[in-house]
């Protein structure tokens, strides 16, 4: 894989626009559409293969299968389907059908009750239809975008938490999915923090995944569900956005692997992007009085989990609290301003191993 250029993919919005354009052309030409060229929001021309092409009286239905490229995307393979009827009105009426979420909470830039088709894809879909209508006797259209299986796909997203119910969102600012990019996930992290702020929440909990989020909810049962935000590997994005949105208190909950990377100053913690620095962990161990032979054992450990096992056996579990202290301090420095940060380390069963509460650069540690 070294040196191989990763393949770009296309967003649900781009595929929806292509399907809508194909359905419009089918109505105007009356001939099967095998391929359709569209203009993405970033003005790039792309040729899409049309999977479904069906004409029934005044209604045409076409679909395009999403290829996410080399991006690990739960909507890869989704069949974005457009059902179109042409009208004489000077308006394109767009709605979501089966498998497209409905907005039920404020703070998303869409009206409550509206289909979760974001503004840029919405504009792109309409533009592609109007492009086809030029020179025809029709001025508008009624369009329904649907995604077979969208409800199941949505279970792997943050949609329900954000108040997007019943399916996936039709997304994309450029039309392109960058392979393994930060773009899509970073956008969801930022959006979740903005929504928490919109609802008056001033304490958020940044977790590194589904398990740590569940454990965090058990540890902090009095917090609103919207307080809990999975940041994955992008802790730095979570911290910076917390500052931007004036969040009063940011709590980090994770396991030893990710927290050890944060303690080393790594704010993008993908396991392939950086490894745990066991030399750093052995230095921490020495700073709290761990015997040299144990410190050497820690330095030679294979993984952060292995370090935890060594500390448990040797009776020096206090290292977990020290790691939490350093994480809070490093995240505070990354924030670049005065922000209160707490850090909790849990094990793989959710047991609390260490914590640092209410660290602030102005007051230091309050354990």
From Swiss-Prot:
Q: Which NCBIfam families match?
A: cbiD, PRK00075.1-1
Q: Which family does it belong to?
A: Belongs to the CbiD family.
Q: What is its EC number?
A: 2.1.1.195
Q: Which residues form a coiled coil?
A: none
Enzyme class of the recorded protein, top EC level: transferase
Keyword field contains Transferase: yes
Pathway field? Cofactor biosynthesis; adenosylcobalamin biosynthesis; cob(II)yrinate a,c-diamide from sirohydrochlorin (anaerobic route): step 6/10
User: Reaction catalysed?
Assistant: Co-precorrin-5B + S-adenosyl-L-methionine = Co-precorrin-6A + S-adenosyl-L-homocysteine
* Alphabetical UniProt keywords: Cobalamin biosynthesis, Methyltransferase, S-adenosyl-L-methionine, Transferase
The protein's name: Cobalt-precorrin-5B C(1)-methyltransferase
- InterPro entries, from UniProt? CbiD, CbiD_sf
Q: Name one GO molecular function term.
A: cobalt-precorrin-5B C1-methyltransferase activity
Extract the signal peptide range: none
User: Which one GO biological process term can you cite for this protein?
Assistant: anaerobic cobalamin biosynthetic process
Highest taxon of the lineage:
Bacteria
Task: Quote the gene name from the UniProt entry.
Answer: cbiD
**Plastid is among the record's keywords:** no
